Amino acid sequence: MINTGRSRNSVLLAHRFLSTGGFWRGGTNGTMSRTINNVNPFKLKFIPKTVPAAADSVSPDSQRPGKKPFKFIVSNQSKSSKASKSPKWSSYAFPSRETIKSHEEAIKKQNKAIDEQIAAAVSKNDCSCTEPPKKRKRKLRPRKALITLSPKAIKHLRALLAQPEPKLIRVSARNRGCSGLTYDLQYITEPGKFDEVVEQDGVKIVIDSKALFSIIGSEMDWIDDKLASKFVFKNPNSKGTCGCGESFMV
């Protein structure tokens, strides 16, 4: 008995073999695998039916145990045909002449403004270099008096100067006494080379230059009582005196 179904399948396979231009070789379990020279004219895709339709549920084939419906989709698109598709060309338009011209004019204006700023800065620097530097005005501060005389001291000094042989009083400071310094008064006729002459109300007094830092700003007074007649000093620079008041320290 001749199996017509199997012979019909072999005829179909032979037609496909001739149409594709490939060759077939035997596979396992009576199947045949097809090999083509880098050409794949069709593909078989296996898609199982997850949810059966209403008509399939009624059919007797679906009710048989152990059998599941299959679905094959044949796609004739190959990799070479997909790769042969050319991509779309991107469109590009060149700028017009007016746009290019306006851009060049804007660049020229910008460069011109930069050149003007540089020239102005250079000219300003040149002018500042040529002008002589201005000298700062010196503020005049009142000079502190080296020594001041009380009215009694002025009266006594005038009496000394009214003598036939006028005498000047020279004030200095010597290292003496308990505290370190003591006032030293001398009668002189002429001031020394480095002495300072102070004049107040027409009365002159000479101060030793070495004693300036010790007695600057002091006030000179004259005391005449039953115990003594002498000149005394009120010195703001004094930090302390001895018990007898003869010496002081600064």
Swiss-Prot record:
InterPro entries: Fe-S_cluster_asmbl/transfer, FeS_biogenesis, FeS_cluster_insertion, FeS_cluster_insertion_CS, HesB-like_dom_sf. It comes from the Eukaryota. One of its GO terms (biological process) is [4Fe-4S] cluster assembly. Keywords: Iron, Metal-binding, Mitochondrion. Transmembrane segments: none annotated. Residues 54-89 are annotated as: Disordered. It is found in: Mitochondrion matrix. One of its GO terms (molecular function) is iron-sulfur cluster binding. Fe cation binds at residues 178, 242, 244. Its main location: mitochondrion. Residues 75-89 have a biased composition (Low complexity). Pfam families: Fe-S_biosyn. The keyword Iron applies. GO terms for cellular component: cytoplasm; mitochondrial matrix; mitochondrion. PANTHER family: IRON-SULFUR CLUSTER ASSEMBLY 1 HOMOLOG, MITOCHONDRIAL (PTHR10072:SF41), IRON-SULFUR CLUSTER ASSEMBLY PROTEIN (PTHR10072). Involved in the assembly of mitochondrial and cytoplasmic iron-sulfur proteins. Probably involved in the binding of an intermediate of Fe/S cluster assembly. Belongs to the HesB/IscA family. Present with 125 molecules/cell in log phase SD medium. This is Iron-sulfur assembly protein 1. It comes from Saccharomyces cerevisiae (strain ATCC 204508 / S288c).
